[in-house]
């Protein structure tokens, strides 16, 4: 599918972005979203049940694939980040795993590991934020800025200063809606393929 070109473009000043439409902004993440601004207090009742998301519970390209339900008193000390609808989770440790998730309709008691940066959209479409944080160039930037060999990590405050493109609000919505639709098509094709493979294996 081809799209009409914008009348004017400008250099974004960001290597992985290249040129962007002239009326777009290029901003730091922390100007469009908060980072780690809600935590579960240590004074929380020990019998309070949480739905815990560990780094291993988020898979590249799949989002949150696994959670653990347990009382706060039995949870690891890193179970602190409160997660809300529309948040984006980005792992700040072992960044090469690309553990990034757009959160949709989570339970009220969902808590993520402090190994995640929890981005909460402010002046940006939450879906567009999720897609921007999944962009190959952005993810590669996160990995490149990580420090350490066997356990590379990036400071959440540094991650929050990374640049992303910021179209107008209507464009953000249109882009996110288009990507939602195309992603759904791909997911449907993958599901059909998996079903076909399963049928072929049954016939062997």
Identify the meaning behind each predicted range.
Residues 87, 180-183, 187-190, 194-197, ...:
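Alpha-helical coiled-coil heptad-repeat register
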Residues 78-139, 153-155:
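A short beta-sheet element
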Residues 5-6, 23-64, 69-71, 76-81, ...:
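Low-complexity, Lys/Gly-biased intrinsically disordered segments
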Residues 8-42, 161, 165, 169, ...:
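Non-catalytic DNA-recognition/assembly elements of restriction-modification systems
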Residues 71, 77-78, 106, 149, ...:
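A structural connector/turn signal
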Residues 8-11, 93-96, 110-115, 147-173:
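A short glycine-rich beta-alpha junction/loop motif
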């Amino acid at each position: 599918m081809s799209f009409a070109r914008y009348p004017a473009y400008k250099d974004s000043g960001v290597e992985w972005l290249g040129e962007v439409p002239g009326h777009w902004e290029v901003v730091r993440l922390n100007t469009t979203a908060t980072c780690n601004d809600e935590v579960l207090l240590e004074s929380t009742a020990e019998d309070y049940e949480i739905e815990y998301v560990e780094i291993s519970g988020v898979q590249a390209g799949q989002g949150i694939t696994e959670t653990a339900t347990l009382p706060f008193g039995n949870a690891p000390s890193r179970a602190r980040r409160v997660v809300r609808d529309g948040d984006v989770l980005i792992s700040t440790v072992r960044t090469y795993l690309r553990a990034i998730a757009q959160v949709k309709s989570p339970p009220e008691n969902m808590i993520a590991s402090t190994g995640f940066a929890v981005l909460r959209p402010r002046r940006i479409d939450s879906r567009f934020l999720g897609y921007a944080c999944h962009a190959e160039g952005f993810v590669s930037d996160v990995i490149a800025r990580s420090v350490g060999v066997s356990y590379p990590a990036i400071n959440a405050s540094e991650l929050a200063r990374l640049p992303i493109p910021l179209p107008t609000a209507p464009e953000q919505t249109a882009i996110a809606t288009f990507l939602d639709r195309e992603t759904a098509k791909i997911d449907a094709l993958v599901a059909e393929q998996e079903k076909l493979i399963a049928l072929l294996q049954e016939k062997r």
